[in-house]
Structure formats: C-alpha cells, structure tokens
C-alpha cells in the first residue's frame, strides 16, 4: 500500500493511494476458489466446477466487489492513520482500475474544524418575563364567556350584531343556482364572519319570517376555486332569531370548565397567558444568544456544509417569495451577501452547539422529540392531529427532527447552566411591543 499526501491544510485532506496488483489478484483468486466449492453449474457436481468456468461467469462481478471493498478499507486506513475527523463521504477521483495494473485512486476528504468552546459564563442576557395581571385574566374570562353564550331567548325584534340567526338560503351565480350555495337550518352569529365577507351584515335589520336578498363577491383566495372571485346573489329566508342570555362569570361558570372554583380557573388562565408568551420569548432569547456567539466564533467551516445551508436558505426564500419575503426588492448581490453571512453564522453556531452537546454528553429523550413535534403542530392551527399522525406514521420524518430537538435542548441547557440571565418583567402590552421591536431590529439587519 502506498500513500502520497497531496494536500493537508485547513479542512481538506487529499491523498493518492495505491495497492499492488498482486494483492488484488490474490483476493480475486481466493474468492473464486471459495466460490468453486459451493456454486451450482449445469453438468458439474457441486465442488467440482473448474475455476476457469467460475471465473468466466462471475469474474467481473467478483473483481468489482473486491475493488469496492479494497477502496473502502484503504480509505478507512488513511482516516485512522492520520487521525482525521471527517465530515460527509470521502470522494474518490482519478480511479485507475485496469485488470493488469495496480489499483490507484485519489481520495478527497473534508474535515471538521477543531472547535474551542468559548467561556459561555461571560455571556449575559436579559430574559423577558410576562407579569400577568388581573386585567389580562379577566379579559380571557370574558372571551370564554362570549364563546359559550347560550342562545335560548327567541327575539321578535330586528336582527342586530351578536344575534344568532337561523336561515335557509339558495345561492345564484348569473341566475343559476349552485350546490355550494344551498343552506338549510344554518345557524350563524351575526358579526362572527363565518360566512362570505358582507353576507352577515346584510341580514341586520331584518326579522323572523322575512326574505332578504344578499349580494356578495367570493374572495379571490376562496377554497372552492370554481367560486373564487365570482359575484353571487343569495335569497335568504330568516327562520329564527335568538339573543344570547347574559353569561355570569361565577363559581358555577368555572365548574363547567373542570375547575373547582373561579379562583382556580383564574390561576389556569394566568398560567396559560404566561405559557403563550414563552415560545416567542424563547425564540428571541435564542437569537440574542446566537448574536453573542457569532461574535465569538471565527473558525473555518466545511465548504459542503456552507453550500448545503445556502441551498436551504434559497429554498426557504423561494417558497416565501410571494408572502412578503424580507428579500423582495433586494439586488442579486445583496441576496448573495445575505445568504453567505447567514449560512456561515448558522453552520458555525450549529457546529459549536454539536460540540458542546458532545462535551456535556447531552442525549435526546422521547419527551424532547415530543416537544418539537408539539411546536410543529402549533404552526398548523386546526390541523394538529394531522401533524401528530404524520410523525407517528413516518419514522424518517422524526429522524429529521432530532437535529433541531438536540439544538433546542442544548440551548436550554446553556441558558440554565452557563450564561448570566437577568429577568426583566413586562406587562402584556409592554412585552408585545418589546417582541415587535426585537423582530423589526432583526429585519433591519438584512
């Protein structure tokens, strides 16, 4: 075996590797002899097949297998011999594989950088904390009361905002009735915007028993494409009108929601309000930590990881370019600079966190993955069960969450055990303003 190192600098190791023809021939001959003992060929007993016939039938495939195994073994030997901390698969180039010549090839290996973990205890950050007050809690109770109103009192007066109206309706487009426009005994709360924009408002002022002509235009983004953007006329029959009975927020009200007392329900809502802010706070905290880390890191990163991250960024941008992307209106040069800067930041921080997790022996538990799946589900309101089923039935998709899950766990460990955190309390309005300001400042950096 011969090894000539062509390049060993930075994160690149290139070498020319060779092995004598005699060793290749020996391995091939040994494999052929072993095969003669068990191969079945018509006209010969097992174990009595001439090696020439076995070679003619299986020689090429055996040689290919031997060459592949030999290359893998030689590359692994080089990695071990030079103590290389590799990333990705080594590239095999300039392969010389003629039957009458020595095996030679060039291997190109990309290396992981040597990472020195900075002193994280020197980092200090403010940690926003929502100070929930009674006003916030009472507002949530009022919302709950509004959602659980009882419409038992029939009204003979004119329809007003907030009334529950029972209707029959037939819809027409260009004087032709369409199936999707037919409603029977349909109940709608006026002002809830359940129906097409403008529909409910045109019922205000009518009474039970009256017929109302309603003219609307289906939104351009309406889910039924055959109706989107079209003008429609509805003939609506008002069958009943009910007003809401006042909801009293008392001990009995609390018991309807599995609370032993009104005070317990208030405590539940206070905790819920606090939890709702945690995800946004954690996201900002994570970005602020990454801002600090970015200034401390200056090691080179593997080119393959950098290109991979740039491609991910480009894919994300292309996917969102019609949704008011932050890069809309930017020149090609500005976009490339943005990709380069953000990709370098992501890769450096990702490698640091991976090294830190390894150093601290941080391991993923089932609950860590469940937490990330819950976060994914919250991004799709109303479709949570579909998201849960997707990950339940797709183990490979769960594997794709292991990286983000370990990153989140590592960041939380750093928050809890390393950096200096100073809690800063905000009211609900102050916190919303703070989070909005932080987001705008981050956008302005692009």
Curated annotation (Swiss-Prot):
Residue ranges of domain PPIase FKBP-type in the record: 162-247
Source taxon at top rank: Bacteria
Catalytic activity: [protein]-peptidylproline (omega=180) = [protein]-peptidylproline (omega=0)
Presence of keyword Isomerase: yes
GO BP term, pick one: 'de novo' cotranslational protein folding
EC numbers on record: 5.2.1.8
An MF annotation (GO) of this entry: protein folding chaperone
GO cellular component terms given for this protein: cytoplasm
Keyword tags: Cell cycle, Cell division, Chaperone, Cytoplasm, Isomerase, Rotamase
Family: Belongs to the FKBP-type PPIase family. Tig subfamily.
PANTHER family in the cross-refs: TRIGGER FACTOR CHAPERONE AND PEPTIDYL-PROLYL CIS/TRANS ISOMERASE (PTHR30560), TRIGGER FACTOR-LIKE PROTEIN TIG, CHLOROPLASTIC (PTHR30560:SF3)
Protein name in UniProt: Trigger factor
Organism from which the protein derives: Rickettsia typhi (strain ATCC VR-144 / Wilmington)
